[in-house]
Structure formats: C-alpha cells, structure tokens
C-alpha cells in the first residue's frame, strides 16, 4: 500500500492517485558571504560634490529627484563622515577595519564607478551661488536617506502617522549640528512624488551602508540613522519576534523551543538556526543583509517562519501586547492551532513569575539559604509522587515544565479552556482591530464562544 495515494471510484472505475499541491518554489538564500569580498554595487561616474549637492537640493525642492543621481551623490558624500573604528571589525571572515583606523561608510562596502555621467539638472530653478558647507551636505544626506524610512511605512498605519514622522525628521535636520536647507513639509511632498524608494536596490544598499556605519561609529552626524534604522534586521521579523519572545518570558532559546508542540515547527526552527550565520555577532553584515543584497528571499521573515511567528504573537495577545494585537496573521500557517497553543503558553507565562532569593547580607546567610533549599529538594524527591490535580495543575511542583503544559493540552483534547477564550476575547474586543491582524482573528474566531 502506497501511503501517499488515495483510492476512489469514478463511474464504477477504481482510480488510484497521489494528491499533489503547489509548493513554494523559491529557495531561501542565507546571507553568509563565501568569497571574502565586501558587498558591492556599481554606480555612474563620481560627481563634483558641490554641483551634485546643488542639483539634488533643487530636485528635492521641486519634488523631481533622479534616483541614479541621488545614489551617486549619497555614495560620494560618504567622505564627509569620517570616524575612528573603536575595535577590530570583522564579519564573515572579512576584515572591515582595524582598531584605530579612520573609516567612512564607504570603507564597509565596495562601490564601483563607470564613466557614465549623471544628469545633475537644476530642476528647482534655484542656484546656490556659494559652495555648500559640511553641515549642509549632512542635512541633505539625512533628508534623502529618510525617504527610505517613509517608504517603508505601510498604508495600514492610521491617521497622520507618516506625516508626523516626516515632520519630526525635518526638525532633526534643521537643528544643530545640521542646518535647515529646505522648506517645511518638503520631505513629505518629495516622498509622495516617488513613494517606492525602498524598492530601488542601489538606494537600499546605500541606506543599509550608512546605517551599519553610524550604528557602530560615534559621530557628530549619527542622527542620520533616523532615516536608515529600518534597514537593521529588515525582513527578519520572524527571528526578531522569537528573540523578543524569549526575553519576555525569561527563557533561553533552547528552553522556549521545548514548548513548541507541533510538527510544523521542525522545518522553521531548522531554517531559523542554520549554522554558519552571524545572527549573534554584533555589527555583522548579517544585520543589514537584506539592504546589502546578500539574500534575495529572507529565511528569517514572518512568512518564512510563519508558525513560529503566529504562536509568538498569540502568546503576546494573551498578555495584552499592542504590538502582537496589531501584527498581521500568517493565514497559511495554522493560525487556529497556533492560537490554542498560544493560549496555554500565555496562561503559563502571564501573571506568574519564577522568584528566588539572590542577594544576602553576608556569606553565612547565603550558605544557610543554600543548605535550606537543598533540604527542600531532597524532601520533594522523596515524595511518593501523588498527583494533586486541584485547580487543573496536573503535576505538583514544576507545573510550568514543557511536560506539564503538554499534558494539560492533551487532557483538554487539544482545545482551549473557557478561561483562555475569555482572555483572548477580553484583550481583542477592547482593541481597534486592523484588517488581518491578530486582534481581528481572535475577535472573529472566539467572540461567539465567550
């Protein structure tokens, strides 16, 4: 008997076939750099910086920016942001810089230049007669890179969220050490004229490069990161959610995964912890792998590890966290089952703590405490093992262990308890639910059961 086949009749004729569904054909690509070469892009001919500044500023004022010119200018302007490397800086075996080296954002990557001239038109009809100062260059670089952050804000954010962010960014770049170079609301107007800056590969690369530099190097103009910070761990929401989750429930990654009672986690956990990556290395290229073009399809995104992502945010919803209630459910990754497991884990880690004395008046008191704790443990081990099932605690002692939680789920037939449903409905009904969010899912799924 073939375990993959089904047998049935059509017009009295026996049919045997293997049902096959469409599978995702895209290969997840890990960002590990194998050739020991720095990430690289190719741009047009390096411009005269004074001419380029005037052209790009006039284009910004007229909301007519040429993306190629913007990228060429941003790469050339890196020379203004020299800093000192605080420690030896290596990533994936590549020596980025040595301690004490003078470096700029351009030291982190390789930027090749062709002989193709840029346009450098003065579309705004404004001609700056003098040469721009370094603070003026820094302000223009900061405003241009902020177009990346604005283009990453989704339309789901309600009200004037994007406009408010743009206004706050403009205020930063008109305050010392920066100087005011554009009229108010210019940034938002420019963004509306071309809202897809984050999809332009070279612009994305440069935003990630600037961010990687300013995240490590102390610099007068470090506030430029306000526009680029979204390139850090971009398309990593699955891994970032998991990291936040284990901190929130105060477990190690290994301890937390023992609670993941579902076969669909296996592939995702293997994918998320692929050996040879620098997920835990500070200031690694890994942090900016998406913007630096090191991975086409991220293995760490919410879609790549959808069951893990769903579970974590159902636990977050149970704990009343707004971020989880607003997050978008990965509909193809068993949200109903994940909501059940999330209810049990939420119950275990919500409103309960694991506490013990850690500080003492003197060494004698510490030793007395440790001796008393040892006696307690010996007594517990000598217990006859009688189970006290009051209040649905099926194990006396370590009720929070993975074994105890798993047993409770099985004893309830893999279904949520009434108390879980009431909690889910309580947190989601008091929240203004966004479309396809966890709050909306819980409201629609469980409100009639409460």
Curated annotation (Swiss-Prot):
Single GO cellular component annotation? viral nucleocapsid
- Description of post-translational modifications: Phosphorylated by host CK2. Unphosphorylated protein N seems to have a better affinity for leader viral promoter encapsidation. Phosphorylation of protein N in ribonucleocapsid may stabilize the interaction with protein P, thereby playing an important role in viral transcription/replication.
List residues modified as Phosphoserine: 389
Question: What does UniProt give as the signal peptide span?
Answer: none
Query: Carries keyword Phosphoprotein?
Result: yes
GO molecular function term, any single one: RNA binding
The record's annotation in InterPro entries points to: Rhabdo_ncapsid, Rhabdovirus_ncapsid_C, Rhabdovirus_ncapsid_N, Rhabdovirus_nucleoprotein-like
Keyword field: Capsid protein, Helical capsid protein, Host cytoplasm, Phosphoprotein, Ribonucleoprotein, RNA-binding, Superantigen, Viral nucleoprotein, Virion
Give the chief site where it resides: virion
Where's it found, cell-wise?
Answer: Virion; Host cytoplasm
Q: What does this protein do?
A: Encapsidates the genome in a ratio of one protein N per nine ribonucleotides, protecting it from nucleases. If expressed without protein P it binds non-specifically RNA and therefore can bind it's own mRNA. Interaction with protein P abolishes any non-specific RNA binding, and prevents phosphorylation. The soluble N-P complex encapsidates specifically the genomic RNA, with protein N protecting the genome like a pearl necklace. The encapsidated genomic RNA is termed the nucleocapsid (NC) and serves as template for viral transcription and replication.
Also noted in the record is:
Displays a superantigen activity in human and mouse, activating mostly V-beta-8 subtypes of T-cell receptor.
Q: How does it assemble?
A: Homomultimerizes to form the nucleocapsid. Binds to viral genomic RNA. In nucleocapsid, binds protein P and thereby positions the polymerase on the template. Protein P acts as a chaperone on free protein N to prevent it from aggregation before encapsidating genomic RNA.
Family assignment? Belongs to the lyssavirus nucleocapsid protein family.
Instruction: Indicate what this protein is called per its UniProt record.
Output: Nucleoprotein
Provenance organism: Rabies virus (strain ERA)
Question: Gene for this protein?
Answer: N
């Amino acid at each position: 008997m073939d375990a993959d086949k089904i047998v049935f009749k059509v017009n009295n004729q026996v049919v045997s076939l293997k049902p096959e569904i469409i599978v995702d054909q895209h290969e997840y690509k890990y960002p590990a750099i194998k050739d020991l070469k720095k990430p690289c892009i190719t741009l047009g001919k390096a411009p005269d910086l004074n001419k380029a500044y005037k052209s790009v500023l006039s284009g910004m004022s007229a909301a007519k920016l040429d993306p190629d010119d913007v990228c060429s200018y941003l790469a050339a302007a890196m020379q203004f942001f020299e800093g000192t490397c605080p420690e030896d800086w290596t990533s994936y075996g590549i020596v980025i810089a040595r301690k004490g080296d003078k470096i700029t954002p351009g030291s982190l990557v390789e930027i090749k230049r062709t002989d193709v001239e840029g346009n450098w038109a003065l579309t705004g009809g404004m001609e700056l007669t003098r040469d721009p100062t370094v603070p003026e260059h820094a302000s223009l670089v900061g405003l241009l890179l902020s177009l990346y952050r604005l283009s990453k804000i989704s339309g789901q954010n309600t009200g004037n969220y994007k406009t408010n962010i743009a206004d706050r960014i403009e205020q930063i770049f008109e305050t010392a050490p920066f100087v005011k170079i554009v009229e108010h609301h210019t940034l938002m107007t420019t963004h509306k004229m071309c809202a897809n800056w984050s999809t332009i590969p070279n612009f994305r690369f440069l935003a990630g490069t600037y961010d990687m530099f300013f995240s490590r190097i102390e610099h007068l103009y470090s506030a430029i990161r306000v526009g680029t910070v979204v390139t850090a761990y971009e398309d990593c929401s699955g891994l970032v959610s998991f990291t936040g989750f284990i901190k929130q429930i105060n477990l190690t990654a290994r301890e937390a995964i023992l609670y993941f009672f579902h076969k669909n986690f296996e592939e995702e956990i293997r994918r998320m912890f692929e050996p040879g990556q620098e997920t835990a290395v500070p200031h690694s290229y890994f942090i900016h792998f998406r913007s630096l073009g090191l991975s086409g399809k991220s293995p760490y995104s919410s879609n790549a590890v959808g069951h893990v992502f769903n579970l974590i945010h159902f636990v977050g919803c149970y704990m009343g966290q707004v971020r989880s209630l607003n997050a978008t459910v990965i509909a193809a990754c068993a949200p109903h089952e994940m909501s059940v497991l999330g209810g049990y884990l939420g119950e275990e880690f919500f409103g309960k703590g694991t506490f013990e004395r850690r500080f003492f008046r003197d060494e004698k008191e510490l030793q007395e405490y440790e001796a008393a704790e040892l006696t307690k443990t010996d007594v517990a081990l000598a217990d006859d093992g009688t189970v006290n099932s009051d209040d649905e605690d099926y194990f006396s002692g370590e009720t929070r262990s993975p074994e105890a939680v798993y047993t409770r789920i099985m004893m309830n037939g893999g279904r949520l308890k009434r108390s879980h449903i009431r909690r889910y409905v309580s947190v989601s009904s008091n929240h203004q639910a966004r479309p396809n969010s966890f709050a909306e899912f819980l409201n629609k799924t469980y409100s009639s059961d409460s």
